[in-house]
């Protein structure tokens, strides 16, 4: 089964997790980036990011290459912003909705507090699915003990490997 990890990362948490998942599963990796970057520090980070997430914004993305026909399983990774998927991921899903319909979809979320379950539900709703095929929630993975994160990521990858 051919896989791809598609992610957005503001502070490197989702990037770190994406690289580990790709290493363990042999997945390709695609980083999604908005044309205009979000602030990554201070109050502006939370105000602009939270507003953009809550308002359901879909910012234009930097050009990327993605051919869904090449993949059986799509793994989507994002930080949780105000209980939502991040706007760049929302744009990607919206732009590729038809090509994602028949795929196995797994997702992981990195957060500092809570809201991942709501974000997964919103992703499900966007994809018109009952549920995702596998999910993983990590709290500040760059700051947590490495072995704990690695065990959780490995368990997630084991679930992804079982998807047929």
Annotated model-derived regions:
Residues 76-77, 107:
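Redox-cofactor binding/interface segments in oxidoreductases and associated redox assembly factors
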Residues 97-100, 129-130:
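Short helix-capping segments at alpha-helix termini
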Residues 131-164:
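Glycine-rich phosphate/pyrophosphate-binding loop and the adjoining helix
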Residues 106-139:
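Short, glycine-/small-residue-rich phosphate/pyrophosphate-handling segment
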């Amino acid at each position: 089964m051919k896989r791809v990890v598609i992610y957005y990362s503001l502070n490197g948490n989702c990037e770190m997790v994406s690289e580990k998942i790709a290493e363990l599963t042999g997945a390709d990796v695609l980083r999604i980036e908005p044309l205009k970057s979000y602030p990554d520090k201070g109050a502006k980070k939370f105000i602009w990011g939270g507003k953009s997430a809550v308002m359901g914004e879909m910012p234009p993305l930097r050009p990327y290459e993605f051919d869904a026909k090449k993949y059986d399983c799509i793994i989507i990774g994002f930080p949780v912003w105000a209980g939502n998927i991040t706007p760049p991921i929302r744009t990607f899903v919206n732009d590729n909705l038809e090509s994602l319909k028949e795929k196995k979809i797994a997702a992981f979320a990195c957060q500092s507090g809570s809201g991942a379950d709501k974000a997964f539900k919103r992703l499900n709703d966007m994809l018109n699915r009952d549920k995702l095929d596998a999910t993983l929630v990590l709290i500040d993975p760059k700051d947590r003990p490495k072995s704990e994160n690695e065990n959780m990521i490995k368990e997630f990858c084991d679930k992804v490997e079982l998807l047929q």
